[in-house]
Amino acid sequence: IGFQLMCSFWNAYCQTGNKDFLSVICNGASSLASRFNPAVGCTLSWRKGAEWEFPVIIDNMMNLELLFYAAKVTGDEKFRQIAISHADKTLKNHLRKDYSCYHVVAYDDQTGRPIKGETAQGYSDNSTWSRGQAWGIYGFTMTYRETRDKRYLKAAEKAADFFIHHPNLPSDMSPWWDFNAYQKGYTPG
C-alpha cells in the first residue's frame, strides 16, 4: 500500500498542492497501522491462513515511507514508531548472514517469535528472490534517510553488495527472477 499511495497520491500532491491527496495518504497510513501487531513488531502482510499465522514479506519495507510521511504530516508519532519497529524486526529476521533476504518470515502472532523464513514468489525458501532483495535495499535506504540510524545504512549497503556482486547477476545487471533459480542446493518450495 505504501509504494502505491506514495508513488501516486504523494506525487499528485507535490504536483498540484491539493491537500485532498494528503488525506488519502493519511488514511492509507492509518489502514496500514491497523495491521500492526505489537507482539510481533510488524505489520501483517497477508491474511492469516493455513500456512502462516502472521506472514511478513520483505516488500513491506516499501510501505514504511508512507508511515514516516504520515507522521510528519499529522504529527502522530505512532506512525514513525510502527515504521521503526517494523524495520528493526525485518533487519533482525529477514536478512541472512550474507545479507540476502527471505521473502516471507512467518511469526507466532501471540509471542512474536519468528517461526520460519521462506518464499512465496522466489525459487526456494533458501534462495534469494531478486525483486524482494531490491525491496529490502530500498526500504533500508529510506529508513536510514528518515532515522539516520547507521544500522539501516549498513543493511542497505550490504544487501546492495550482495545484489551487485552476485555471481549469477548477468552482465547487463538486470537480474533473473531469483538469484539461485535452478541451482544445485536450492529446491523449489
Which stretches of residues belong to each language-model region?
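Glycan-recognition and catalytic cores of secretory/periplasmic carbohydrate-active enzymes
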Residues: 1-189
